[in-house]
């Protein structure tokens, strides 16, 4: 099972308050573990505020300043000082990994210089930190009924209001959160 380019959607019964009602985009999943970014956990800083904190000046005139008011997200509890930009592919940046035709992840600072300008990606979220699992850890959590998995949808990442992402992700399975039980079935 490879969950790269899938969402992990926290079950309503998620016991860990850090991940309660979270939606995580899985960037990498292999025999060594998994790495993903929470896409619905905004923190109390805007993209523009973050750019000021790290002394990033825009490479072009800021024609899209409204986007600088977007929140930065908590990507997860690991390396919270590291930034990740989940975006629609546009240009090639120094350190980008194209996940699909519609989703890429960039960790280099060069993408930050185009945020708020006409050269910015069509859709993006900025996350600090990531969610990580050691080898076999995610698989155990799945058998414990902690997560639902669904194929990633760029519309949910980039165009769905933050407060609706968890419910919309569950609805993609054709169910509502109220229909979910925390009890795993055994045959």
Swiss-Prot record:
Matches recorded under Pfam families: DUF179
Top-level taxonomic group: Bacteria
UniProt GO cellular component terms: cytosol
InterPro entries according to UniProt: AlgH-like
Family that this chain belongs to: Belongs to the UPF0301 (AlgH) family.
Protein name: UPF0301 protein VC_0467
């Amino acid at each position: 099972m490879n969950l790269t380019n899938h969402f992990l959607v926290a079950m309503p019964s998620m016991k860990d308050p850090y991940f309660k009602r979270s939606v995580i985009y899985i960037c990498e999943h292999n025999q060594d573990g998994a790495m993903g970014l929470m896409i619905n956990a905004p923190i109390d800083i805007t993209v523009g505020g973050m750019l000021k904190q790290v002394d990033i000046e825009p490479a072009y005139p800021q024609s899209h300043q409204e986007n600088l008011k977007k929140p930065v997200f908590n990507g997860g509890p690991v390396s919270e000082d590291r930034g990740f930009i989940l975006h629609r592919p546009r240009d090639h940046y120094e350190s980008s990994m194209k996940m699909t035709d519609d989703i890429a992840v960039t960790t280099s600072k060069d993408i930050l210089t185009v945020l708020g300008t006409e050269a910015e990606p069509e859709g993006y979220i900025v996350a600090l930190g990531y969610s990580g699992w050691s080898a076999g850890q995610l698989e155990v959590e799945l058998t414990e009924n902690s997560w639902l998995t669904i194929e990633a949808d760029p519309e949910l990442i980039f165009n769905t209001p933050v407060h609706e992402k968890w419910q919309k992700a569950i609805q993609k399975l054709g169910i509502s959160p109220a229909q979910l039980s925390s009890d795993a079935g055994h045959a």
